[in-house]
Amino acid sequence: MTNIRKTHPLLKIVNSSFVDLPAPSSLSSWWNFGSLLGVCLAVQILTGLFLAMHYTSDTATAFNSVTHICRDVNYGWVLRYLHANGASMFFICLYLHVGRGLYYGSYTYSETWNVGILLLFAVMATAFMGYVLPWGQMSFWGATVITNLLSAIPYIGTDLVQWIWGGFSVDKATLTRFFAFHFLLPFVVAALVMVDLLFLHETGSNNPTGIPSDSDMIPFHPYYTIKDILGFLVMLTALSTLVLFSPDLLGDPDNYTPANPLSTPPHIKPEWYFLFAYAILRSIPNKLGGVLALVLSILILAIVPMLHVSKQRSMMFRPLSQCLFWLLVAVLFTLTWIGGQPVEHPYIIIGQMASVLYFLIILVLMPLTSIVENRLLSW
């Protein structure tokens, strides 16, 4: 008798995706982040669902409803901080996942890569709208500053901003629609994840060497299921530690002050995971130029496959490219630090230099280095 997992119409899909899926035998822990992102999404949807049961999306009561969740709801504080810090964990896994893709040349699977970029934008939009919901000072002013950037679009900019706001400033209508979209988008993300996996399973996984591994495959279960479960435990332990010992470590104290349109905080900044893009935005004195640089800092990932001129897929055997990759990582850390600093000397010039270097490494230095490495190979 054939096993039910191979014959049942629904279980057959699960079986071919998670049980009998052929996977390269050499996958390292860097390949854990896809499944970790799935766990993060599940945690966010579950905690978000329970938070939405107690939250009210009205400017008069939003801040108090979050306080009520933390003080009066059974384990409401755990839900709230799991959700807030779960977002940080989500972005840590996202950035490591993208970094792994860049390092090992996974971007040559262009469909999977492009769906991944769409996912990145969707998660960023979701996180931004979620940050507005507690209706603290940083929520209000962050929403005002970031949505206002759209006014830089020629001709339709101002109308577009007012259309998003639902009025002439960030107010009740804005908060209500942001809550609606914040609730909806994670399910769009979940659907995109299915599409991402569909494309990935068409080609199969890449591996650290970048060499086709069709001749050396092992079943996903039990080898990689066990490996993934270890990843889950490590990540959930880190998340629990953060939530239980230092839940406000990554937050902004200004968000414990209710939103006040008449009082601007001294330093308006987004959550830490957007600081690198915010630093690039601020480093250009022109408003439209800054907005374009902000969008391009993420969208640049879409042209990375076109800039791949190396004869080797992975950076595993390309020491010069490795040096550039880690320089890029250092530049991103620098930008994240600068994004959280006030706009004054010497932070301005450091931010501008780091921004130029960011684009220079990806657009010019990496392709040139690949050409040099190709020449070295043929010697």
From Swiss-Prot:
Keyword Nuclease set for record: no
Keywords for the protein's UniProt record, in alphabetical order: Electron transport, Heme, Iron, Membrane, Metal-binding, Mitochondrion, Mitochondrion inner membrane, Respiratory chain, Transmembrane, Transmembrane helix, Transport, Ubiquinone
Cofactor note as given: Binds 2 heme b groups non-covalently.
One GO CC term on file: respiratory chain complex III
Binding-site positions, heme b b562: H83, H182
Cofactors demanded by this protein: heme b
Residues that hold a ubiquinone according to the record: H201
UniProt topology in membrane: Multi-pass membrane protein
Keyword S-adenosyl-L-methionine appears in the UniProt entry: no
GO molecular function: metal ion binding; ubiquinol-cytochrome-c reductase activity
Domain of life: Eukaryota
Main localization (coarse): mitochondrion
Residue spans crossing the bilayer: 33-53, 77-98, 113-133, 178-198, 226-246, 288-308, 320-340, 347-367
GO BP annotation list: mitochondrial electron transport, ubiquinol to cytochrome c
Family, as annotated: Belongs to the cytochrome b family.
Miscellaneous comment in the UniProt entry for this protein: Heme 1 (or BL or b562) is low-potential and absorbs at about 562 nm, and heme 2 (or BH or b566) is high-potential and absorbs at about 566 nm.
Subunit structure: The cytochrome bc1 complex contains 11 subunits: 3 respiratory subunits (MT-CYB, CYC1 and UQCRFS1), 2 core proteins (UQCRC1 and UQCRC2) and 6 low-molecular weight proteins (UQCRH/QCR6, UQCRB/QCR7, UQCRQ/QCR8, UQCR10/QCR9, UQCR11/QCR10 and a cleavage product of UQCRFS1). This cytochrome bc1 complex then forms a dimer.
Protein name: Cytochrome b
Name of encoding gene: MT-CYB
